[in-house]
């Protein structure tokens, strides 16, 4: 019988942790057990949850008690979709005190019902023809209220700086100044021109927004227009919505999952989901080719262990393509050695102000990032590289080098 394993962190679980775990296993499956007659227990046994592990530990405060428990849920109890799964293992339980869902282990049968990334790390690299270094992405900044001519010029300047990907701001919606379809068409023309000028290919991720009922048609139209990638605020819509986009054969476009709203689900040490589960495993399983999340050293920083755990879930060996991890927020060129130390080659360096705020503009910012990436790959001293690349020197003079965390 196939089972799904859910692992929880309980804070102040009560005097009897084993009893609490058994109550959860029973309460979220058959509802009651000891009150059932023996014949009914035999009939219901295949539906009953099982306690797999109970491990007590000290909490963050000296007087605080915590426990990690793992419960097996028979998959016969729910349909093979994420809404049914989450309602089963963390529906009413999420309202029952200090309980955090930290991991899910899926059966191979359930995995077959999920799409995973269409492209993944290798597929994105293949689109760009770049396999030997971290990719570099920049972000449109300050575009609210700007018309299409401003958007086009920002796109051009970023591409000329040598970035591999450019994404819309997640708060850039349909307001009439720069319509979705027009941005795609005009963006493709700009990037065609910069490729002809530099020989460097750049992809543009356009923000897919609007009412849920309209998203598939809008995404299909984007695909028809040749969109390179779709930025998607997955946690404003739901994982199942992203899954629907990812598994649609008429939307053969990479999906870039933005973490907006996810902090409401992950930030508490006592409630919600672990960062690794929500931004790593579930994003990957539901079809994200890219997963953005705060880096350990930027302006909106995650603890290093949490950021590394997200990355691990994105790339660990599994039934699905790997998801590109995109540590973000407040990234500048001086952070690149830390990013490459912690996340290796297969991640994307994502910068906004670190590109646009460069003294030589977005082109200079892109060149500074590319120079320091090359220096790290070649084991060249950063200061030596800065003497060879004026843009890098200006960036380091402005932002400095990030300290190890």
UniProtKB/Swiss-Prot annotation:
Modified residues annotated as N6-carboxylysine in this record? 167
Coiled-coil portions: none
* Pathway(s) served: Amino-acid biosynthesis; L-methionine biosynthesis via salvage pathway; L-methionine from S-methyl-5-thio-alpha-D-ribose 1-phosphate: step 3/6
* Example GO molecular function: magnesium ion binding
Active-site residues are: 92
The protein's matches in SUPFAM superfamilies, at most eight in alphabetical order, are given as:
RuBisCo, C-terminal domain, RuBisCO, large subunit, small (N-terminal) domain
Q: Which InterPro entries match?
A: Diketo-Methiopentyl-P_enolase, RuBisCO, RuBisCO_lsu_C, RuBisCO_lsu_C_sf, RuBisCO_lsu_fd_N, RuBisCO_lsu_N_sf
For this UniProt record, the keywords arranged alphabetically read as follows: Amino-acid biosynthesis, Isomerase, Magnesium, Metal-binding, Methionine biosynthesis
What Pfam families does the record tag this protein with?
A: RuBisCO_large (PF00016), RuBisCO_large_N (PF02788)
- Cofactor(s) for this UniProt protein: Mg(2+)
On cofactor binding, the record's note says:
Binds 1 Mg(2+) ion per subunit.
Binding-site residues for substrate, renumbered to this chain: 141, 167-170, 258, 330, 352-353
Gene Ontology biological process terms in this record: L-methionine salvage from methylthioadenosine
The first-level EC class reads: isomerase
**Might you give the EC number(s) for this enzyme?**
5.3.2.5
Under the heading NCBIfam families, the entry gives: PRK09549.1, salvage_mtnW
Task: Tell me the protein family, please.
Answer: Belongs to the RuBisCO large chain family. Type IV subfamily.
What job does the chain carry out?
Catalyzes the enolization of 2,3-diketo-5-methylthiopentyl-1-phosphate (DK-MTP-1-P) into 2-hydroxy-3-keto-5-methylthiopentenyl-1-phosphate (HK-MTPenyl-1-P).
Other noteworthy facts: Has no RuBP-carboxylation activity.
Designated name of the protein: 2,3-diketo-5-methylthiopentyl-1-phosphate enolase
Gene this protein is translated from: mtnW
């Amino acid at each position: 019988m196939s089972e799904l394993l859910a692992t929880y962190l309980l804070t102040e679980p009560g005097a009897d942790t084993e009893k609490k775990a058994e109550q959860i296993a029973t309460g979220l499956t058959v509802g009651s057990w000891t009150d059932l007659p023996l014949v009914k227990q035999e009939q219901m046994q295949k539906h009953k949850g099982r306690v797999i592990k109970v491990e007590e530990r000290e909490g963050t405060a000296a007087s605080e008690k915590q426990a990690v428990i793992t419960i097996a849920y028979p998959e016969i109890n729910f349909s093979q979709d994420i809404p049914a799964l989450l309602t089963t293992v963390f529906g009413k339980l999420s309202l029952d005190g200090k309980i955090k869902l930290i991991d899910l282990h899926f059966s191979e049968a359930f995995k077959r019902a999920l799409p995973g990334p269409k492209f993944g790390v290798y597929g994105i690299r293949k689109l760009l023809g770049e396999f030997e270094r971290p990719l570099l992405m920049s972000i449109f900044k300050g575009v609210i209220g700007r018309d299409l001519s401003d958007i086009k010029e920002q796109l051009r300047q970023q591409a000329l700086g040598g970035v591999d990907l450019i994404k819309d701001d997640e708060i850039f919606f349909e307001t009439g100044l720069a319509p979705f379809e027009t941005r795609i068409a005009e963006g493709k023309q700009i990037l065609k021109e910069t490729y002809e000028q530099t020989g460097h290919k750049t992809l543009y991720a356009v923000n897919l927004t609007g009412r849920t009922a309209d998203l598939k048609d809008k995404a299909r139209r984007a695909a028809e227009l040749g969109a390179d990638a779709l930025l998607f605020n997955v946690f404003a819509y739901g994982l199942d919505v992203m899954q629907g986009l990812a598994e649609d054969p008429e939307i053969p476009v990479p999906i870039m999952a933005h973490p907006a709203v996810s902090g409401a689900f992950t930030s508490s040490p006592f409630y919600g989901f672990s960062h690794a589960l929500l931004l790593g495993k579930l994003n990957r399983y539901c079809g994200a080719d890219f997963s953005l999340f705060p880096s350990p050293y930027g302006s909106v920083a995650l603890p290093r262990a949490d950021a590394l755990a997200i990355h691990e879930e994105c790339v660990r060996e599994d039934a699905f393509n790997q998801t590109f991890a995109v540590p973000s927020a407040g990234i500048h060129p001086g952070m690149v050695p830390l990013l490459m130390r912690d996340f290796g080659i297969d991640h994307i360096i994502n910068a906004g102000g670190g590109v646009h705020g460069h003294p030589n503009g977005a082109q200079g910012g892109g060149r500074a990032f590319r120079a320091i990436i090359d220096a790290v790959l070649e084991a060249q001293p950063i200061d030596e590289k800065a003497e060879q690349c004026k843009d890098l020197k200006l960036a380091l003079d402005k932002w400095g080098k990030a300290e190890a965390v």
